[in-house]
C-alpha cells in the first residue's frame, strides 16, 4: 500500500517551485497534484493520456473541447486523451489531483 497526505504533497510541490508534482507512477496510471493560483493562466496542452481531475480546493472554470463548466472543491472532471482543455477564471487558488491513464510520460 502507498498512502499520501495532501498537506505534505502541497508542501513538497511548493518547495520545488512547480505547478505540478507527480507523486505516484504505476504501470497503468500516474497521479499528481496540480496548482494554479487565483488569476493564473493554465498553460496546458492536450495530453496523450485520459485524465481525471478531482478538485480538492479552489474555484475556477474549465473548458474541455467546446464545453465549459464551473468547478470547486469536490468537482470531478474527465478529459479524454487528445482533447484541448484548460482551467480559466481562477477566482480562488486551485489545487487539483490529476490521474493519467496510461501514466504520463
Report each predicted region and the residues it spans.
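A short, N-terminal "cap"/entry segment at the start of jelly-roll beta-barrel domains
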Residues: 1-33, 43
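Short strand-coil-strand connectors
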Residues: 27, 63-67, 90
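Ligand-binding loop in jelly-roll beta-barrel domains
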Residues: 81-105
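Structural motif
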Residues: 52, 59-61, 68, 84, ...
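Short, conserved beta-strand element in jelly-roll/cupin
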Residues: 36, 47-62
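Short beta-strand/loop turn elements enriched in aromatics
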Residues: 28, 38-49, 102
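Short acidic-glycine-tyrosine-enriched beta hairpin
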Residues: 67-81
Amino acid at each position: 500500500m502507498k498512502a499520501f497526505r495532501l498537506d505534505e504533497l502541497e508542501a513538497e510541490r511548493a518547495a520545488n517551485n512547480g505547478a505540478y508534482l507527480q507523486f505516484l507512477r504505476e504501470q497503468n496510471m500516474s497521479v499528481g497534484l496540480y496548482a494554479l493560483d487565483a488569476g493564473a493562466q493554465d498553460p496546458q496542452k492536450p495530453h496523450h493520456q485520459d485524465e481525471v481531475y478531482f478538485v480538492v480546493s479552489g474555484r475556477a472554470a474549465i473548458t474541455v473541447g467546446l464545453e465549459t463548466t464551473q468547478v470547486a472543491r469536490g468537482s470531478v472532471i474527465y478529459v479524454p486523451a487528445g482533447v484541448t482543455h484548460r482551467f480559466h477564471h481562477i477566482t480562488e487558488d486551485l489545487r487539483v489531483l490529476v490521474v493519467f491513464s496510461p501514466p504520463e510520460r
